[in-house]
């Protein structure tokens, strides 16, 4: 995944299954763990800010300062990375994959997928009739 992928401070994006290095900021670390565990659910920065008892603005700023990503950029990027993994298995249709990784709107999934990969999901892994 290359096109619009956020690349953090190091210039590289870690593999999803790698054990990430602990973040220095406890809020950023908590956000990263929460996203990795709950990416398929409806989650929002507001939910996290309430759980961590910090304002959305400060929480997002701390996350971006530590990771190079905004909350929404990382969440969408992580979801698309998971979608690509599921596509490679070839066991599900694209609309099913979209739902499994947390997108309730298939058209929005396509838009975000293209943003982060540079391609439509149908171009990379054609599956015939997807809907």
Where are these regions (language model features)?
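An amphipathic alpha-helical interaction segment
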Residues: 1-15, 58-60
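Intrinsic-disorder/low-complexity coil detector
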Residues: 5, 13, 19-21, 120, ...
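Basic/polar phosphate-binding segments, predominantly the helix-turn-helix DNA-binding elements
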Residues: 34-38, 42-78, 98-124
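A short, Lys/Arg-enriched amphipathic alpha-helix from helix-turn-helix/homeodomain DNA-binding modules
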Residues: 13-43, 49-52, 76-92
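Generic C-terminal helix-cap and adjacent flexible tail
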Residues: 126-131
């Amino acid at each position: 995944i290359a096109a619009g992928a956020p690349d953090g401070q190091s210039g590289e994006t870690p593999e999803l299954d790698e054990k990430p290095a602990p973040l220095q900021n406890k809020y950023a670390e908590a956000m990263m763990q929460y996203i990795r565990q709950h990416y398929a659910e409806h989650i929002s920065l507001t939910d996290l800010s309430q759980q961590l008892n910090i304002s959305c603005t400060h929480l997002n700023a701390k996350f971006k300062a530590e990771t190079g990503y905004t909350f929404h950029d990382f969440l969408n990027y992580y979801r698309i990375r998971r979608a690509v993994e599921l596509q490679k298995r070839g066991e599900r249709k694209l609309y099913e994959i979209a739902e499994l990784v947390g997108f309730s709107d298939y058209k929005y999934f396509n838009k975000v997928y293209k943003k982060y990969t540079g391609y439509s999901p149908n171009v990379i892994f054609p599956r015939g009739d997807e809907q």
